[in-house]
Amino acid sequence: MQSALFLDYGRLTLMDRERMDAVLKKYGCSLWNFAGSYGLGIALMLILLVLTFAGTLHQVRLSSAMGSEAAIESFFGAAYVLIPLGGENSLISLPLPGMGITCVLLFANLLIGGVFRIRWTWRHAGVLVAHGGILLLLAGIMLGNKMTVAVEQVELPQGDRVHEYSLPFDLRLNRFVPEFYPGTSKPKSYESQITVFPESGGQYDAVIRMNEPLRLSGWTLYQMSWGQDSLHPGRLISILRASHNPLEQMPKWSSYIIAIGLLWHFACVFGRYLRRKPGLASAGTAVTAEPQAASAPGGKKHLRLAGICLLVAAIFGVGMLAARPAAHPVLVKNYVPWSPALVERAGAMAVLDGGRLKPVSTYAGFHLLRTLGKRSFVVDTPEGKRKLSPVEWMLDCMFRPELAEQYPVFLVNREEVVRRLHLPDQKDKRKKYSYAQLAERWEEMTRAVREIRLLGETNLTEAQKEILSLARNFDVMRGWMLVSRIMLENPAAMERMEFPRWFPSAGRDGERLWTAAPDKAAGAFLAMASLLERKAIGMEGAEASALRMKAEGLLLEKLAQPNEAASAGERHSLEREIFYYRLDPLYISLAVFVAAFVCLLLCALFRPAANAPLWRRFLRPGGFSLAWLTGAGGTGVLAAALVIRMLITMRSPVGNTYETIAFIACMGVLCALVVELFSKKGIVLAAGLLLGAFSCQMGILYEASQAVDHMDPLVAILRSNFLLSTHVITIVLGYAAGLLAAVLSHIYLLASPLRLISGKTEQSLDRMAYGILCFSLVFTLVGTVFGGIWGNESWGRFWGWDPKENGALMIVLWQLTVLHVRKAGWLSSWLLHFSNVVGGVIIAFAWWGVNMLGVGLHSYGFTSGRDALDMFYWFEAVLCVLFIILHYRALRRVDVR
């Protein structure tokens, strides 16, 4: 008898055949429907999200032991993975399919459900185009990885074997040309000048530069790195990478298709929203806290709003105090201020620092910020309290060291540092010491630095790092003070090429340094001014004033000359930079956004009666308009600051982490202002102002903690083409929209259970949160793909599972999951907003968290912000628990009714 599993279809009767066909059709249709179902697609995206996060942590755990590439391959190349629950040594693990299997299943699900089963109508045309682009992208990545052949420098341990690839050409390196920024070892660019010998015969010259590969005979040659030839000292070697991938350009065209499809779809959705929205062009505006039957009584509502106002005011007050710490002036006898003309002239001088020309005011400002944590300090003088600028501090260090050594400009944050260096104790938590106090403990500091350096740079405590930083800042100030001493003891030593050792120069090439004065006379010229100034300190009356005026005249004459060596364009750039730091755009925007937010809250609290005078009834919409215009003004300040930075640096406005903060603040508020024109509820404007204010405050604190000039030029790999600029700007714009949606959802989750908003307002918030999330998805998805294209164009790797890449992918996967669950009707309004809050946490991880993991190409090694980031995670966790409790209580209140 034949097994039931292997029936002979030809011997069955007609009735049996029909029954079997029906069974096969039934189960086949069920399998087909399941393979293309929403549920399976959502589950696969969540699995991809979990795998991406777990794989990132896997790299952190094993990269130091087995290498980054091996750690990546051991997780993302596995057929299945076991993710430990509860820690690395947990006995319970979550089994999941590997990344490759999951991607194949997602491809099949998207092909069946997103192309074959979807209705082919103009309404779904954008979705179809986007799905087609994603399918091409997945196919290009999966097939391209299998078909790619890469030849590069390989370290081969003894006993291992290597595959040999014959290239259809030979290369000869004629010359390798590295270029560095002036005065630094930071590479600006490097190129290999080669001669190519094809198999077909002949030869021709070519150049391979960083970010500018050479394509020939189906192969792509990338400039990877360079080094010193160990066999021939003084000779340079060029490290190239050869890659052969027939599908190299598929991700690029796929990303264009995805962008067109998403923009098309969301434009159609937005158009339908505008057509459905009643009274869009009607006059008047509605602000938060609309009255309706289901809302709280008026008195309780106003008390709750007042409590929220006080809480927000307290948060911003503490933040602004932290951003601008209070001054503790010290009495400095015999202090006489520098003339304003001298300070302005000295601050406008051009110096070479960090590979670029910058004003002395910027140079001194960051040194003071690094030493004291702020850009100015207050001293007590015989004429009263006086605020000293960085330039005045620097001039005092150079020409009046007996005064400068009294200034308490060295900030110490940790008690352990005070005890280790035997410094005098102070009551303040943030202790400030003078140069004279540290000089008395010079031996202890030197001994501590020597012991710390023996430990290496890794695994140092925060106190040890602070001691090293304190010693470096002390050495800088000591070097400035030596200028005056050397000029007095040996004026001839201050020659043309000697002075720049103590004070950076205005020239680019080392040949135009301080060219205004004769070589031998420069030292004597400045020594005379310094000697006159120091003599005047011990005198009184008209004689001292005359000497000071003579000394300042000499200094003015000397300091006025170096800028003549700068070109007109350089002088304009210096003037812009001086204006930029005088403007202090982040602090101005912070104050403006807080003022606009307070105005908006006052509008919500103020509710005139129906029979009130006309002028009182217009106060509320007038206040709302004032808040909108004030927010627009703060956004304009940030936009102007970004434009000024572009003109100074001559690159895109987003080139480092600090610039992303200002860009997110600007774009987040701008997006809220635009949405507010359509919603007219005031809530999205409040969310945008909160986002802008928090971002500005974070930027101020971040700059103070890092104390690094973020306008310094970028390294060679980041001086790229259009793709890099597009990638960074696009994805950061997606960050801004995603964070705006998260802040808006925070407001909803807090206001809805407290009955501060009406039912119609809740529906409007749902639509706004959904629309902003869609906007964020467009830019995060396209920006992530653009980043892969840039990597493929620059060094031949589209995707390498780097933590920064994984963070961007996590954002995209989460937003796609939320939108698809919402489309399926499985996500209530509360869950949509709760998901946006979780999305905000994921954006924070991708934006900041991955920078602190210590692995990957984008690990910046930040340590001072880890505690703040951990506090943010805990704060969001507590808020999520609070939102759940409030929602549960609101549901119980409805059930009781």
Residue locations for each model-derived region?
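Solvent-exposed, non-transmembrane regions of integral membrane proteins
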Residues: 3-897
